[in-house]
Amino acid sequence: MREKTLYARLAWTGMRKNRRLYLPYLLSCAGMVLMFYILTGLSGSEVLGHMSGGGSSAIILRLGTVVIAVFALIFLFYTHSFLIRRREREFGLYNVLGMGKGNIARILLWETVITYGLTTGTGLLLGVVLYKLAELGMVRLLQVPVTYTLTVSVSSLLAAAALFAVIHTLILLNSLRQLHGVSAVALLRSESVGEKPPRAQWVLTAAGVVLLGAAYALAVSIKEPLAALLWFFAAVIMVILATYLLFISGSVTLCRGLQRNKKYYYRPQHFVSVSSMAYRMKRNGAGLASVCILATMVLVMISSTTCLYVGQEDAVNARYPRDMDVAVYGRSDHPLDEAEAEQLRQGVESTVFNFGGQTSNVATYREISVSGLPDGGDLRLGNAGASAADSTRVTQLHFLPLEDYNAATGQSLTLNDGQVYVAALRTDFPYDTLTVDGEWTFRVMDRDIPPLSGPFTADITPTLMVVMPHFTQFVQELEDGLSEKYGWYLTATWHYAFDTDLPENQQGNIDGTTPNLEDALNGYLAGVSSDWGVGVSVESKAANRADFYGTYGGLFFLGIMLSIVFIFAAVAILYYKQLSEGYEDQSRFDIMQKVGMTKVDIRRSINSQLLTVFYLPLVLAGVHLCFAFPFIHKLLILFNLDNRGLLIGTTAVSFAVFAVLYAIVYKLTGNTYYRIVAEDTEKE
């Protein structure tokens, strides 16, 4: 019986004696389980599922569970490598004392079982306790009524238990792979084996500089939001690769340069730190690069999602400037004439009046749209032979009658034949003439007129709004030409947007039960659609606000959750980096003390090393964030939020708060390093 429990006791004893190493790892595992359970539970929550906007949030949270699962696998593998490295000498001693590789494998198996049981049990217990708090926070972000029913998601419990069972099994198999084929002597000497600096430092450093410069140039040169969306992930990959190259090879190059500077290098506070850094920078640089990337991810996520959440009402108002928006479209023979538009207007107002409301702040206009590829000031409508790269350049062209634009905006603009006004959205139009498919050319009298908000802001593609006289005549000419040239038929649309004095729950179909104006208008327009052969749509700001809040609130909540995970991951990496380097430097500082180096000199040397490398990730993350700002701004435009001042504010506050947290971590981990290299050496 004692033999059966021997391996379990050895595993537990080894973990307990190395608690300085294992405790952060166990906490990290439990934290990952906790976060995964909460996100999985919320993504399938019945409470959120029955709320307006809850569906959008659920989709976002499901994506978050995938991110957590993948990150947990990578991060736990990374941190476990520190544990194995520190335990290799212990395993070598077991081997020398008569234990075979199979016996050591049993110890590792029991360590895995104990780790899985402790962390999964603790994480799930905390998850069940804190789940309701997270759900209440999510409900609060969605701005919907709160429910206090306590629920336990059995499916989420099983999913978390299964996922982390697989992760710990893979970690165990990797540990056994590392153990297999290594001799006892190699295990005993593992802690004294130095890390060789990477070869061809100058080549790798130059590659990192080129990659980073290319990513930065890409970030500041892209003008269209859709192009920013498509190129964003390519830029992210380039920045990640460049960061690793610069921290691994660039750090070695920096250390070699400092060693050549005799006035700097041959000082007590610099000599030990620089010489030790030069021979361990491959692993040290990778850790610092990981911290830099995690810090950048946190800053980008929290600044952008905070900006979205704070500015969500601005986004709603930009997309829906009025309470209701009615659209009638689909006539290919001719746009609605004034008499037909008046008939529709009276029908809509009569429906609103019969429902008990009144219309105000009315905006009504007609428009017709085409799309094509810009070639200077010419928009080419025939896209045959266009490449995949051209998809980001496709531009929507909306033509509006001058009289409708004036009525909708309250202006009194005038135009002569052949003249137009242009408003550019999500693109630039610096030209004095506008040509449509090489045939119709207009002189642009003003390129900066205020665009009509509403449906135009919903397009994610570059858009030009063109205001022109003699609208009906031009549309007929355009349709005749396009029909003959491409076989196309145009779609004309009539918009009627207005405010109403009805309460929000009677404006749109919010809860699916209350009679509302949106359903009444759809009923009236269904008859119009049948009689006239046109398409119709009715959109309510009140009903769509819930979807906006669901999407933006979900992104904000996910940004907070992932930021917490990434911050703790960065802290764990920094802690293990300082811990492992502290143990490796302990003997070096012990020798330096014996030849006359004082505790004050040791402290100065430690501060020199920490200040040299510890703040590099934060500084470079700040630089990454500055160059990512144009990308972030353009991506937020795709969410109908174009508020540069708000984004600057949230970005600055996010960086300031993160910098304070980073400084606190620097202080704590620096003290850990100092205690290992200074106080432990004194005991000898």
Please give the residue ranges for each predicted region:
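Basic-flanked hydrophobic alpha-helices used for secretion and membrane insertion
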Residues: 315-568
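Hydrophobic alpha-helical transmembrane segments of multi-pass inner-membrane transport and secretion
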Residues: 20-47, 56-92, 112-126, 206, ...
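N-terminal Sec/SRP start-transfer signal
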Residues: 1-33, 197-202, 211, 246-295, ...
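Hydrophobic alpha-helical segments
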Residues: 114-258
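Juxtamembrane interface at the cytosolic side of transmembrane helices
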Residues: 78, 86, 178, 224, ...
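Short cytosolic juxtamembrane segments of multi-pass membrane proteins
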Residues: 2-6, 180-195, 583-584, 674-684
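Short helix-loop junctions at transmembrane helix boundaries
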Residues: 41-54, 124-156, 213-230, 617-680
